[in-house]
Structures are given as structure tokens and as C-alpha cells.
Amino acid sequence: MGETMLPTRRLLVLGAAAALLTGCQTTPPLDPGTVIGTIRVDVSRLVELGVGPRAEVVRTRLEQELARAFAGMRQPGGATLTVAVRGLTMPTYVGGDIDDGATSDYLESLVTVTGRKGEVLATYPVLSMNGAGDSGFWFSPGIDERRVERLIVNHAAWIKKLTLG
């Protein structure tokens, strides 16, 4: 009986937490007429944390994904979208775990949109997550690269959703 109740309790707790967090996003989406001129991704914090060459991969690929995501609203001289990547977490994954969040990959950033005169138009904290096993078997060649790629694509999608609504 205890085992069958555990998922129900977990869902109840997660549901309550989600309900409490519903109103936490206080920054509204950008105005519909806002155009983006420049996209910058700062990974200096990842370098400080010792992420190594993966930091440059995050910078390059996130810039590419954001350019694709905002392609319809890019215009020279528009606002600047700056993404300061604050953390990349990829725990060791050896498969077989129940997805309880302990084997999840995370990418965290602070997105700031500034106007032509340098005024801050909006700021959005972004935390995206993927299951570590979502990218394939733990023993597959290139699994860590696929995990990073999935995080980047997911993160860019969340940035677009938060900034555009």
C-alpha cells in the first residue's frame, strides 16, 4: 500500500508546488513591436566554473538556436538580447534510475533585453531541464554532446516563450 501511495503523494506535492509558482513570472513578454538587433551569449561564468571547452559549445550553439528562434523579429538597430549563462549541470548518468530529478540535466541563465539607448526592457531568469536519459543510452558514443545539444535547444525554446509570450 505504501508504494502505491507514493506516486499519489509525490503528485500532490508537485501539484501544490506548481500552483504556488504559477504567479512567479512577473516580467511580462516583450511588446509585440519589439525587434531584436543583436543576440549575445555570455558563458564567462561557465568558464569560471571550469566547464571547459563545453562552454564555447554552449555559446556558439545557443547563439545559433536563438538566431533561428527570433528570425522573424530580427532587424539591425533593434534591441539587444543578452543571455548570461549561469550554470550547466550534467550529473553522471548510468541508466536504470527512476526519473526523480536526480539524473536531470540543467541549463540556467539570466536573459536581459536592452533597448537602443541601453535601457533595460526586460529581464528573465531561465532554468531548463531535460532527463539525462532522454538523449539515448548512457553508453552510446557522443551521449554527452547530445545531452548538451538537447539542453541548448530546450533552453532557446524557453527563452523565446518567456520573451514573446
What residue spans do the PLM features occupy?
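A structural "domain/chain start" motif
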Residues: 2-7, 11-15, 22-61
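Short secondary-structure transition/capping segments
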Residues: 6-16, 26-35, 112-132, 160-165
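Generic secondary-structure microfeatures
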Residues: 10, 62, 66, 85-89
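Soluble non-cytosolic domains of exported or imported proteins
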Residues: 52-61, 101, 142-150
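Extracytoplasmic/secreted envelope proteins and their assembly/folding machinery
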Residues: 59, 63, 67-70, 149-152, ...
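Sec-exported extracytoplasmic/periplasmic mature domains
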Residues: 67-71, 90, 156, 160, ...
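Surface-exposed short loop/turn segments
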Residues: 72-121, 132-141
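Short secondary-structure boundary motifs at beta->alpha junctions and helix caps
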Residues: 119-158
